[in-house]
Amino acid sequence: MALIEQLVARARADKQRIVLPEGTEERTIQAADRILADGVADLILIGNPAEIAKLAQDKGLQHLEKATVIDPLDHPKKEAYAQLLAELRAKKGMTLEQARVLVENPLYLGCLMIKAGDADGQLAGALHTTGDVLRPALQIIKTAPGITCVSGAMLLLTQATEYGENGLVVMGDVAVTPVPDAEQLAQIAVCSAETAQAVAGIEPRVAMLSFSTKGSAKHEDVDKVVEALEIARRLRPELKIDGELQADAALVPSVGEFKAPGSEVAGHANVLVAPRLEVGNIAYKLVERLGHAEAIGPILQGIARPVNDLSRGCCVQDIYTMVAITANQAIAAKAR
């Protein structure tokens, strides 16, 4: 079964409540109709109900009546959510009046619903920047226990089935933290492993990437990767993780055996952790374009409950897939 089909099947089996705060956006509406038709998730659309109804009628969408539609300007829990936000941000000086204004912002409203237990995850970004999507998530939902660093992982589905997990590789960070320190890099590794388990459904074998393998080069950047490996092992002693490894030593069995003999990860890695954002971002785009891989994501990780960000150039299928991914993350978050 293809990865997307697996994600959809798991989501259907344990339906999660996913908020789409850009509820009047055309691609979002079309994806929502497909999601509801297929039973992938219980959707909460935030937006003007009349506008959503008109869009549904104009596009001939038959399943949107299954969604919960919330008007951000007029709904029963508006005051309760405002009080919750004011409490959460009291140390930052937020007043109740300021909170009442922010609650009318769909991105804030969706995150407050998650915090209050009224929803399980959120997906946005068709109309908003990554910063717009992340800001309320970090202010309201906050990072996961023991995690201070948010990052983004990409699923790369390649035709090179001899590498990774039958051609599937998870790569992080590709989206959020430009120059992680050793502690942050360790957290990126741990969170990328969790994404591999929760979303890809695979047992992670994590390689901490570098231009050096096991001391073949000396540099402060290599030292940071080695330190991050030690921290990651303390955070997750049971995790299969090794480094520092060059990309070929991480992926190619013969090279891994030669350069890092005795490693249970070298030559068999299915999770690749880049030492800095520019490396991860450039690498995944090269694999996608030159290697004709399918790139799915980025999948935000490190937040206590799933909030994901779309590209503003996304298509209907991208939104459909990311809802399924967000639902799988929500299932995993509840199980932790």
Predicted features along the sequence, with ranges:
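Anion-binding alpha/beta catalytic cores of soluble intermediary-metabolism enzymes, centered on
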Residues: 1-266, 271-336
